[in-house]
Amino acid sequence: MASASAQPAALSAEQAKVVLAEVIQAFSAPENAVRMDEARDNACNDMGKMLQFVLPVATQIQQEVIKAYGFSCDGEGVLKFARLVKSYEAQDPEIASLSGKLKALFLPPMTLPPHGPASGSSVAAS
């Protein structure tokens, strides 16, 4: 598939599923799991540090897989892949599910505060 690397990557929905599955599988490879664990430990659940430590490692892992499918081996290639996946999410529930699994591998779960808008008065002002 060497000729594809010279052209912009265009994947069908079925091909996108295959690539997503390969990317997710790459995160479970022992060496990548260690890299991600170390990055998460360094980040200490701090969102700013997640961007500093975890996101670059996650990007590198994705790059290693998607370059075989014609995406550039840089941050731009990962962004193009993410945009392509996003374009298929609404049409294909399996792609949406795989995309969610991929994001969960490197984005911390977003938790909402336990109170609703009506109970905002219980928050102490400092």
Curated annotation (Swiss-Prot):
Lineage of the organism: Eukaryota, Metazoa, Chordata, Craniata, Vertebrata
Pfam families xref list: P_C10
Protein name as it appears in the record: Protein C10
Signal peptide: none
Subcellular locations according to the entry: Cytoplasm
Keyword Transport: no
Recorded family membership: Belongs to the UPF0456 family.
Predominant location: cytoplasm
Tissue-specific expression: Ubiquitously expressed, with higher expression in lung.
Purpose: In brain, may be required for corpus callosum development.
Taxonomic source organism: Mus musculus (Mouse)
N-acetylalanine modified-residue sites: 2
GO CC terms of this entry: cytoplasm; nuclear speck
Biological processes per GO annotation: camera-type eye morphogenesis; cognition; corpus callosum morphogenesis; post-embryonic development; psychomotor behavior; regulation of skeletal muscle contraction; third ventricle development
Key words, A-Z: Acetylation, Cytoplasm
